[in-house]
Amino acid sequence: MARRGGFPGGMPGNMNNLMKQAQKMQRQMEEAQKQLEDAEVTAKAGGGAVEVTVSGKKEITKVKLSEEVVDPDDIEMLEDLIMAATNEALRQIDEQSQASMSKITGGLGGGLF
């Protein structure tokens, strides 16, 4: 009796469909990653006194400071505001990335993405 479809060793023919779905998911993930790389988010701290823009590649592309926060006697506050805005922008990029990957994987991956 001849076997139809499947792989040697008795794997079912549905394995072909599974492989096709995996390849499709991989293409979608690559496409989503490209879109994320092109994304930018801007986060503000200190009521908008400090703005930091981060790319999807997690590179800081812009830092904007309001004159009122540039106080030579309080550099520590400025440093804190820059750090807060940067961390928030990075958090937003991570959130976008996770949401995008979740759409593709349907929640699969156990936190790998």
Curated annotation (Swiss-Prot):
Record-level GO cellular component terms: bacterial nucleoid; cytosol
Bias (Gly residues): 1-12
Coiled-coil annotated spans: none
Pfam family, one: YbaB_DNA_bd
Location(s) in or outside the cell: Cytoplasm, Nucleoid
Assembly: Homodimer.
Name assigned to this protein: Nucleoid-associated protein EUBREC_0329
Origin species: Agathobacter rectalis (strain ATCC 33656 / DSM 3377 / JCM 17463 / KCTC 5835 / VPI 0990)
